[in-house]
């Protein structure tokens, strides 16, 4: 699901080791457009789930080098590297576990329970099957093999926004603690010194 076409899948296989070598995971890759205006769109993240502008630039440089050397795409194209965003696609089995409890839209490659498209709350993963509590149907949980899923995306809700804000706050807090630990015992003195310079 990280790649949609055979060409996408081949590019994922080529670029996965490059992304991992610089500390990122490819969430989704799509080669879009016609022969004249192609666009290679890559969504990626760090293992902690974050991805800022500097991360995108770093990964873009690493990917560009291998694409220039291997030349797997015929003709001209534009490379776009971005974060998956808040209402992100879910493309790996672990995503369905990580985001359990949140609202999601899922599309299957076949009919199940009389339809291909579903909306509901993720119920996690059990034996390689993705669980979904169906919207508007009390106590109805359905399970699909991960391989049946062709598209899945989180639904933008207040709960999702709150969770995203909490995760960002936790990361910022952890980064601040790491910075103070790196400074050692002089951390408070350094802060006091900089404050006195502003007066």
Curated annotation (Swiss-Prot):
Subcellular location: Cytoplasm
GO cellular component annotations of the record: cytosol
Residues covered by region (Disordered): 166-199
Taxonomic superkingdom: Bacteria
Key word Cytoplasm present: yes
Protein family (similarity comment): Belongs to the RimP family.
Record-given protein name: Ribosome maturation factor RimP
Gene source species: Caulobacter sp. (strain K31)
Lineage: Bacteria, Pseudomonadati, Pseudomonadota, Alphaproteobacteria, Caulobacterales
